[in-house]
Amino acid sequence: MRWDAEIRIGGRTIAPTEPAYFIADIAANHDGELARARELIWRAKEAGADCAKFQHFLAGKIVSGPGFDELGAQTAHQAGWKKSVVEVYDQYHTRRDWTEALVETCREAAIDYMTTPYDAEALESQLPYVPAVKIGSGDITFDPLVAQAAACGKPVLLATGAADMADVEHAVEQVLARSRQLVLMQCNTNYSGSEENFRSVNLRVLQSFALHWPGMVLGFSDHTPGHAAVLGAAALGARVIEKHFTDDNAREGPDHGFAMNPRTWREMVEATRQLEAALGDGVKRVEANEGETLVVQRRALRLRREVPAGHRLAAEDLEALRPCPPDAVDPRGLGAAVGRRLKTAKAEGDALRWTDLA
């Protein structure tokens, strides 16, 4: 199976040599209000996001009321919800009749529009508007939806939270059987926002993905607080970064508490851009901004005392001291300089140059 090492999303090229592409997952943080959804698009753009992403689901097509009743109690991040799982999904879904308004707002804000669809109809309804399709971690084993997304002719972003390598391999095969355009995303699906989650985010999985699928475009869907994990992921090769986004972490709702806000999002983007600049290209060289320090920090061979022209140099005539002018003999040249005669007289402290030697 083959995959593309470069992928286009909207107007951006996603590749190892390109800046990371930031997806602000607004998800349920519109709180069921179109006006809030549109405002969050603008706030995400202003904070430096490349994409505003939503989630399209209908409660009856994603969760089973009796199934959750059988569990006896809501667990994981759902344990803090004040309503049943079905009620929460029903309250916070993104209405499909909002689509054109959301797309138009994204166009006005000059930010890409994207969604995570959770059923076949949602995917079909959104395809005309999105540059790529995100598959959430929970659907990594939902082959029909994965296959449908892969066959749509647009890049697939595949999240891999709460999955083992066998799960990932299977889902990747489903995509690559139909498309070469895949972004494989490491993810941890604990949404508590606890700092303890740093112990489980396992960024080195990105290295495992890179070894298993060399050249594949990698990404990171993050739910940890702050942006430390994002910086680590970017350093390990993630070129697509997704985090939840809100305008107010204190608002009531399933996703506000662990989301980034405009201030922290901007800080994350700026820190990542600094990191990307710092990573460089891996070629070891004297950098342009080191030219002056090279002179003042390196040592040159210098005369310990005044010597006349014709003097045959001995090791005790020379010492290695800063600075080292560009044409001076550095300490590595001591063996080659000893025993040579001077063409001209040299004063105490003068730097020795190869042109001084006969």
Set out the residue ranges of the language-model regions.
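Catalytic cores and adjacent flexible loops of soluble metabolic enzymes
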Residues: 1-358
